[in-house]
């Protein structure tokens, strides 16, 4: 019976249970998912999500979260987005109202920013 309770509790856990809060600003919180880190030499890839307290508007639709797969150059302290989507629900849940799977150019990471916090998680 105890095992059944544990299984049911784990199954009921929210989909965002693995997210780790890494940065916070007025009305937003940014989370990284360390379980998604994939390393290839000096480059690490990881999913992260920015969750908005208030509904954000884009033309005629809106969203509560922004989910991104990014690559991090652990040696040169830079990053680039590989895939981004905007979601109707919090924590990257719900319908994606926008998606872009374009690999963007590498950008230097600015110290003491959300980007640096994410880079530290991805690169250890």
PLM features: residue spans?
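N-terminal secretory-pathway/extracellular module detecting exported/lumenal segments
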Residues: 15-124
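Sec-dependent N-terminal signal peptides
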Residues: 4-13
